Amino acid sequence: MKLNKYIDHTLLKPEATKEQIEKVIEEAKEYDFASVCVNPTWVKLAAEGLSGSDVKVCTVIGFPLGATTPEVKAFETKNAIENGADEIDMVINIGALKSGNLDLLERDIQAVVEASGEKLVKVIIETCLLTDQEKVLACQVSQKAGADFVKTSTGFSTGGATVEDVALMRQTVGPDMGVKASGGARSYDDAQAFIKAGATRIGASSGVAIMKGETASGNY
């Protein structure tokens, strides 16, 4: 697979303007990225802008804290799909995981999986807040709940993806589930390191810099 098709071209900062979102959409079409990842308020604009292209519309649910209820996440998911979303990146209930409430954690993920129908679901586990044991548990529960991907990070917490976390996640889920590295790829070399570790998708605001072989600044 070509590098461009690993990249979810991402703009999730709360202050993003319509003009900035439109720029990301145009860049994604130019480089034929896997998707554009935007907040739910921009999904309709992205769907219109990407109509007729191969670039998917990705959005985020329960973002960035993951601390809403399963019912709210399910509603958000359905609303996003009605507006044109093809892929759903949800944040887990991190507190449930930390409290050992794996039933709630699974129900949280399942609610989004069921609401998404046939759409792709990626589960953000926020690795920077977890122990290695919790990372493994989060991946196992995501897999059991029927998600398509596990994803490292929101890009809005204390840290982003590391090669070590990607490798651990890949080792945990095996070959049949996607692993998305986000919040750490700022250069071509970063992207290649994540792919080598087992990532099948990379979330980055630096997609253009990565494709040009440059290094970008920023935290996502």
Curated annotation (Swiss-Prot):
It comes from the Bacteria. It is found in: Cytoplasm. Gene3D superfamilies: Aldolase class I (3.20.20.70). GO terms for cellular component: cytoplasm. CDD domains: DeoC. Keywords: Cytoplasm, Lyase, Schiff base. One of its GO terms (biological process) is deoxyribonucleotide catabolic process. The keyword Cytoplasm applies. InterPro entries: Aldolase_TIM, DeoC, DeoC/FbaB/LacD_aldolase, DeoC_typeI. PANTHER family: DEOXYRIBOSE-PHOSPHATE ALDOLASE (PTHR10889:SF1). This is Deoxyribose-phosphate aldolase. It comes from Streptococcus gordonii (strain Challis / ATCC 35105 / BCRC 15272 / CH1 / DL1 / V288).
